[in-house]
């Protein structure tokens, strides 16, 4: 309430002591007065403290090397992809840190990231580990579930709802989060030629995603699903949300070969054939993604492309044993809680890795293979006090026989079963 009491003399601001005729307005409270100048000063102090809190949070941003070191603890191999991600993520959050009063006219634009690699090569794990490293909200979405507005399926805004939920509905936190959109290659146009048939999960979805990739204020239904005219919406600005797009892009090697073929005319076929799959992917360019079916505007919003290599037996064995949360360590700990030691022979680790390659599941399939070999043991061991040690051998994996079981004195107690 604004009030001047003209019956009283010498009304003063209770904070700065100025008389009412020295200021524009004097606001009366319960026995106190505050002038417009002190109100402005208080407002500035509050804004500075809020900005300082944001700045302090961002000063904890790790360097690219520190990000890379943390990724190395959980993700084996894929050095080039990890380095590209570390630099891109560092620059992204440094850009957010720079936001505020502009000292010059240079505006740093957001750079979203595309991860291209086969199933089980570590795309999702890289994105998850990045979010944990930076302690920001993280959400995963599957592009195959998205359709353009008006068709059965999810609206692209539902991706943002998952991030908001991950941030416990703290919009400020969500606006600095990371969203990983998997299977992005599945929304490529079915052909480079525009068809009269509606491609409801292709170009239309790319157009819808385009808006949130480049930065917009989106209206998100708090309960998910389709929007309704009278529904209350959550407003979220996507300008500072980092999008990581992942996809296998099966067959893109042929697209790259066709492009390279235009430049190797006159050479022998052997010269052109020397490009193996990894070497081809290393030479991927925006025009290859366009030929695959992504629209130019969409590609322009994802300027950073990192390639993930197909994992070989050695890499998969390292994944089984080396990361902080390696599967072998997890299952060893699980049986340790029942006072049972678990061991994997080198041959068993090789057999697990070879089976994952055979199934074309990459690192993603390692857990299911181990689970298959241990399910009976994990069922029986808690009620069998004689077993103190379990050894997984190559025979266990390849022939689906029972692991070797030992008692406290080191005696093999299921010899007849393992040789059956």
UniProtKB/Swiss-Prot annotation:
Listed binding positions for Zn(2+) are: 13, 16, 35, 38
Is Zinc a UniProt keyword of this protein? yes
Quaternary assembly: Component of the ClpX-ClpP complex. Forms a hexameric ring that, in the presence of ATP, binds to fourteen ClpP subunits assembled into a disk-like structure with a central cavity, resembling the structure of eukaryotic proteasomes.
Please identify the protein, giving its name as recorded: ATP-dependent Clp protease ATP-binding subunit ClpX
The record ties this protein, via PROSITE patterns, to: CLPX_ZB
Query: What keywords sit in the KW lines?
Result: ATP-binding, Chaperone, Metal-binding, Nucleotide-binding, Zinc
InterPro entries linked to this entry: AAA+_ATPase, ATP-dep_Clp_protease_ClpX, ATPase_AAA_core, Clp_ATPase_C, Clp_protease_ATP-bd_su_ClpX, ClpX_bact, P-loop_NTPase, Znf_CppX_C4
Q: Which residues form the ClpX-type ZB domain?
A: 1-54
Q: Name one GO biological process term.
A: cell division
Q: Gene3D superfamilies of this UniProt entry? A: 1.10.8.60, ClpX chaperone, C4-type zinc finger domain, P-loop containing nucleotide triphosphate hydrolases
Family, similarity comment: Belongs to the ClpX chaperone family.
Residues that hold ATP according to the record: 118-125
Q: What terms describe the molecular function in GO for this protein?
A: ATP binding; ATP hydrolysis activity; ATP-dependent protein folding chaperone; protein dimerization activity; unfolded protein binding; zinc ion binding
In the UniProt record, the gene name given for this protein reads clpX
The record's disulfide annotation reads none
